A protein has these predicted regions:
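Glycine-rich beta-strand-centered segment in the early N-terminal region that forms part
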Residues: 31-45, 58-107, 112, 160-164
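Cysteine-cluster motifs in flexible loop/terminal segments that predominantly coordinate metals
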Residues: 96-150, 154-156
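Mid-domain Rossmann-like dinucleotide-binding core that forms the NAD(H)/NADP(H) cofactor-binding site
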Residues: 149-150, 156-158, 162-247, 251
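C-terminal hydrophobic helical "lid"/dimerization subdomain
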Residues: 3-9, 255, 263, 275-279, ...
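Residues located in well-ordered beta-strands
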Residues: 12, 24, 29, 41, ...
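Glycine-rich phosphate-binding loop and adjacent beta-alpha segment
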Residues: 270-338, 366, 372-373
Length: 373
């Protein structure tokens, strides 16, 4: 093993004991990394809607007790046997989508769909958690559990980056930036000059707007019900903003584009937004669904326009990421001034303020909140 040897250590983590109850900061025991795993001391973690949905019960079946957090960055402290790509001292972005490199999807170049991925089950790829409390297992949300001062993750969940990249900014690349930018560039492959609309411009949606600006989409239309978010979208590249609480977004998109949008992106977990985004498509257009609605949500759709207009509705999981290539590339885009991250960070919190971060996120007050350690 590289790095200081240990068998078990205590660290501080924000634990969800039951859905619909507040998080509690506890001293949680952390087991040493096993074969193919690494121990990471966290620098920062983003506050993501997926974690809010897990906590507030929107998503059912979340195992408890569990340490939430699915995007973050930190420094490798130790590595387990067989680790090849990392060593103690490396700066890493954590990814909730580990890859095995051997399954059907990894082999065909779609590692974000790896068959070993099980983020909702609260365990590492080999099937267990490295965290415990009073002898009871504590689950690790999204394979990484970033609401902890220290965590153990699979080697493929930790992507080494340039040490000159600030770790608090790097934390957001691990999910919201990758998911939003990747949906535009990887999943949809939006060409220059194509029109696009983004429904929901929170953390992920703002990054979809940024992705559109990177590929020179025109126009880029932001849709939300919160005025402050629409203003942020304009700062990040949106050419038009629609307040869906005051205007019909479908009618406005058609007015702006004259025929409907070539691409629409749904970056909010709302089935109604999916229906609107599909209706706003131009013939031949593609609706990309990024946000995951509450468990059991369904979308009423008029199928005829899909067929006669050859419109497409498809999902985008994690921005169709190839993490080992895409995450370092996003770091370089930030360092080169082409990707804005500082502007995404609305507020910083300590670990003991995670409940307040969730409240602010639910109230629409945050583009992205950041827990710093």
């Amino acid at each position: 093993m590289s790095g200081p040897p240990f068998r078990r250590t205590a660290m501080r983590a924000s634990v969800l004991f039951e859905q619909r109850t507040p998080l509690k900061v506890e001293d949680v025991e952390l087991e040493a990394p096993r074969a193919g795993e690494v121990r990471v001391r966290m620098a920062a973690s983003g506050v993501c809607h997926s974690c809010l949905h897990a906590a507030d019960g929107s998503w059912t079946g979340v195992p408890v007790p569990i340490v939430l957090g699915d995007e973050g960055a930190g420094v490798v402290e130790a590595v387990g046997p067989g680790v090849q790509t990392l060593r103690a001292g490396d700066h890493v972005i954590l990814s909730w989508a580990p890859t095995c490199g051997r399954c059907h999807y990894c082999v065909i170049g779609r590692p974000n769909l790896c068959e070993q991925r099980r983020p909702g089950q609260g365990v590492l790829p080999e099937g267990t958690s490295r965290m415990s409390l009073g002898g009871r297992p504590v689950y690790q949300y999204g394979h990484v559990a970033t609401y902890a001062s220290v965590t153990v993750v699979a080697e493929s969940s930790a992507i080494a980056i340039d040490k000159n990249m600030p770790l608090d900014r790097a934390a957001l690349i691990g999910c919201s930036v990758m998911t939003g930018v990747g949906a535009v560039i990887n999943t949809a492959a939006v060409p220059p000059g194509a029109s696009m609309a983004v429904f929901g411009v929170g953390g992920v949606g703002l990054n979809a707007v940024q992705g559109g600006a990177m590929v020179a989409a025109q126009p880029i239309i932001a849709v939300d019900v919160v005025g402050g978010k629409l203003e942020s979208a304009r700062q990040l590249g949106a050419t038009h903003a629609i307040d869906a609480s005051k205007e019909d977004p479908v009618a406005e998109i058609r007015r702006i584009t004259r025929r409907g949008a070539d691409f629409t992106f749904v970056a909010v977990g709302d089935a109604r937004a999916v229906a609107q985004a599909a209706e706003a498509l131009a013939p031949g257009g593609t609706c990309v669904v990024i946000g995951v609605p509450a468990t059991g949500a369904t979308v009423p759709l008029d199928v005829r326009p899909l067929v006669t207009g050859e419109r497409v509705i498809r999902g985008s999981s994690y921005g169709s990421a190839r993490t080992r290539e895409d995450l370092p590339r996003l770091v370089e885009l930030y360092r080169g001034g082409r990707l804005k991250i500082d502007e995404l960070i609305t507020r910083r919190y300590g670990l003991d303020e995670a409940n307040e971060a969730f409240r602010a996120l639910a109230a629409g007050e945050l583009a992205r909140g950041l827990i710093v350690f």
